UniProtKB/Swiss-Prot annotation:
Gene3D superfamilies assigned to the protein according to its UniProt record, in alphabetical order: Ribonuclease Z/Hydroxyacylglutathione hydrolase-like, Winged helix-like DNA-binding domain superfamily/Winged helix DNA-binding domain
Protein name, UniProt field: Atrochrysone carboxyl ACP thioesterase dmxR1
Reaction(s) catalysed (UniProt annotation): atrochrysone carboxyl-[ACP] + H2O = atrochrysone carboxylate + holo-[ACP] + H(+)
UniProt-listed GO biological process terms: secondary metabolite biosynthetic process
InterPro entries in the record: LACTB2-like_MBL-fold, Metallo-B-lactamas, RibonucZ/Hydroxyglut_hydro, Sec-metab_biosynth-thioest, WH-like_DNA-bd_sf
Organism taxonomic ancestry: Eukaryota, Fungi, Dikarya, Ascomycota, Pezizomycotina
GO molecular function: hydrolase activity; metal ion binding
Top-level enzyme category: hydrolase
Keyword Hydrolase in record: yes
The encoding gene: dmxR1
């Protein structure tokens, strides 16, 4: 499949991806190449999903885990026939079989290869596991343990990118399969920002050193990557709060100390970034991102909104920057 053509679009529905085409094209061009099949640790073989794209990066990483004659696999790619061929060849060459299929979440670039696995290995029909399973799948509970020779894998429910998102800890390596919550390059799109940030805090609490992401290279300092991702989001929150405080102060200075300083998202973006922004970037990217941050801050009790003449306007609550 040609780079840039494949990939399951997993992004906030409010966000129009056209605003990011140039950035995504540039990012994809600089990605390091990954081997189709690579033994990345004594217990882990990475098999690329053969679906490179702007959202899937080099392709979906699927992981065969264990050292014995029966192993488990995490994620199944997008349903590309070449991936199924790689899996079949890898199992044949290694003289081992699969006993469990663990799915990180429902997105098609992670579950699309399940029919191919069942075609190749019908006995797996009772061994497919996912949080919030379909009829042919088994449930995964938070803390559930899966064991094969050489590997103990513990499930961690970590929603945010999606409500059913699971990560998996490989106990023997103090490593975590991070799914789409933390990627090998860049940052992930999320369904719910507050939930995702809480999930990252939870992931960090397990003190795993290494991360095996669903897209991109191995993360050698998982703790540092998570810390950096959270710090970036907190910086953006503070930028939004600072801008709201600025608007509030200006309004009160002009109104004798009265006023909430409520503004629309469009007005807030202008306060933060000026009025000379490209219209597409503003409307298709910055405004949806800013509103997502505002919703998270509202859940935290730091901002609120009011409806004036049918228009939603946001304002800071108290001294939110303290």
């Amino acid at each position: 499949m040609a780079p840039g053509k494949g990939g399951y679009k997993q992004i906030n529905k409010a966000l129009n991806i056209c605003a990011f085409e140039d950035y995504l094209d540039g990012q994809q061009a600089t990605l390091p190449p990954l081997q189709d099949v690579e033994q990345i640790s004594p217990r882990v073989i990475r098999v690329l999903g053969q679906n490179p794209g702007k959202f899937t990066l080099q392709g979906t990483n699927t992981y065969i885990v264990g050292t014995g004659s029966e192993r488990l696999i995490i994620d199944t790619g997008q349903g590309i026939p070449d991936w199924a061929d790689l899996i079949s060849t890898t199992l044949l060459d290694g003289n081992f079989s699969l006993s469990h299929v663990l799915l990180t979440h429902w997105h098609g670039d992670h579950t699309g290869g399940v029919p191919d696995l069942l075609r190749l290995y019908p006995d797996l029909i009772s061994g497919i596991y996912k949080h919030t399973p379909s009829k042919i799948q088994q449930p995964i509970e938070d803390g559930q343990v899966f064991k094969v020779e050489g590997a103990t894998v513990r499930a961690v429910h970590a929603p945010g990118h999606s409500s059913d998102h699971m990560c998996f800890i490989l106990e023997e390596e103090q490593a975590m399969f991070t799914g789409d919550n933390v990627l090998g390059h860049g940052t992930s799109a999320v369904e719910h920002l507050s939930t995702w940030m809480a999930a990252l805090q939870q992931m960090k609490s397990h003190n795993c050193r290494k991360g095996y992401p669903a897209h991109g290279i191995v993360i050698n300092d998982l703790q540092g990557r998570i810390t950096g991702q959270l710090a970036q989001k907190f910086r953006r929150e503070r930028q939004v709060l600072k801008a709201l405080e600025q608007v509030k102060s200006q309004e009160r200075a002009m109104a004798g100390g009265r006023g909430k300083g409520s503004v629309t998202v469009k007005q807030l973006v202008s306060t933060m970034h000026g009025d000379s922004l490209d219209g597409g970037i503003r409307e298709l990217a910055l405004e949806p991102f800013t509103e997502e941050i505002l919703r998270k801050l509202a859940e935290d009790g730091k901002v609120a909104f009011e409806i004036r003449t049918g228009i939603k306007k946001w304002f800071v609550v108290g001294t939110a920057l303290d």
